[in-house]
Amino acid sequence: MSSKDFFACGHSGHWARGCPRGGAGGRRGGGHGRGSQCGSTTLSYTCYCCGESGRNAKNCVLLGNICYNCGRSGHIAKDCKDPKRERRQHCYTCGRLGHLARDCDRQKEQKCYSCGKLGHIQKDCAQVKCYRCGEIGHVAINCSKARPGQLLPLRQIPTSSQGMSQ
């Protein structure tokens, strides 16, 4: 569904605030599609929760009633009668198994966004890749392949088999 579709009724050809089925009414803020004029065709939906056509997930009877423990509908995980599914805890800070980031003893260490290793940040990383020239070892702001203040559009970045052309 595009941003031009009216989410409340699923029909097109009108402004959200003038929906003949109600919905946004004249409310301010938060309305999906508010201010967008739709096309002239009726939309066909398929719910990604239950797979039924003719409804979207927003109106699905299963929404909010799927158990994250057993995967069945009708209850939520805290009320599940099945044994709790064992989940492997994975730390997003250090990458080790067995704990979560909030419990990591290495939380204070710097983590590089380029290589994912601890102990340095991206500007000091030897494996960082330049968005201007594609070479490894520097970032775009420090690239010598372009004139100061000039950014090379991505379409002009040469491939490894081509040279720089200006």
Swiss-Prot record:
Q: Does the record's keyword annotation contain Metal-binding?
A: yes
The chain's disulfide connectivity reads: none
Query: What highest taxon heads this organism's lineage?
Result: Eukaryota
**Record lineage:** Eukaryota, Metazoa, Chordata, Craniata, Vertebrata
Q: What is this protein called?
A: Zinc finger CCHC domain-containing protein 13
Gene Ontology terms for molecular function: mRNA binding; single-stranded RNA binding; translation regulator activity; zinc ion binding
Under InterPro entries, the record lists: Znf_CCHC, Znf_CCHC_sf
Q: Where are the zinc fingers (CCHC-type)?
A: 4-21, 45-62, 65-82, 89-106, 110-127, 128-145
What processes does the entry annotate via GO biological process terms? positive regulation of cytoplasmic translation
Q: What organism is recorded for this protein? A: Homo sapiens
GO CC annotations, alphabetized:
cytoplasm
SMART domains in the record, alphabetically? ZnF_C2HC
Q: Which PROSITE patterns match?
A: ZF_CCHC
For this UniProt record, give its keywords in alphabetical order, as a comma-separated list. Answer: Metal-binding, Repeat, Zinc, Zinc-finger
